[in-house]
Amino acid sequence: MKPEPQSEAELMERAHDIAGLSFAELADEAGMTVPENLKRDKGWVGQLLEWHLGAPAGSKPQQDFSKLGIELKSIPIGYNGRPLETTFVCVAPLTGVQGLTWETSHVRNKLSRVLWVPVEGEREIPLAERRVGTPLIWSPDKEEEQILRNDWEELMEMIVFGKFDQISARHGEALHLRPKAANAKALTEAYSSNGKPMKTLPRGFYLRTQFTEQILLKHYINVQSE
């Protein structure tokens, strides 16, 4: 793995250096094997980018570049330039949630400064031939942060009151909550609506594609107008 970048400028320079390169080229330099597909290797693209950008944190609660306060997110893009899937932010806490605030939440910490790296994501393009796009660095503006905060507070309130069965895909404008488990047997501790301990599927916070699409649009419109 490349050494950890010491500044945001150095990180961005590295991200720009790999823009336009294929996964095969990047994997070759990193000594990694390109899998046939991502069904069993969902985190492979992220690991490849982490190697080239020098991200030391892995999937711990802190940001990928904790010294710089920056989170790395790859974002698969379709032919139309739109995100193809939601973006995982972090695992949702289901116990010990009393007194949690937006200001100290993992979601806010992870999304305070994000390096977005678009990658070709159309399934008909062989994985080895997919290329990395132009990176962008982003922090939520006041409006975006308010939307995220409102969503987080609404969803966390439902968790506090044990309303897991009532949380659906329609809750949350930018952020939504859904089960995150490789199989249905991977249960975790939680509390039911009557306060009794129970087992349920782990949940994860995800950004909706409409929200990430707006981030990309705003950025590239601003770049073109400069």
Swiss-Prot record:
SMART domains: MutH. It is found in: Cytoplasm. The keyword Transmembrane helix does not apply. Transmembrane segments: none annotated. Pfam families: MutH. Its main location: cytoplasm. GO terms for cellular component: cytoplasm. GO terms for molecular function: DNA binding; endonuclease activity. The keyword DNA damage applies. Keywords: Cytoplasm, DNA damage, DNA repair, Endonuclease, Hydrolase, Nuclease. One of its GO terms (biological process) is DNA modification. It comes from the Bacteria. Belongs to the MutH family. HAMAP family: MutH (MF_00759). Sequence-specific endonuclease that cleaves unmethylated GATC sequences. It is involved in DNA mismatch repair. This is DNA mismatch repair protein MutH. It comes from Vibrio parahaemolyticus serotype O3:K6 (strain RIMD 2210633).
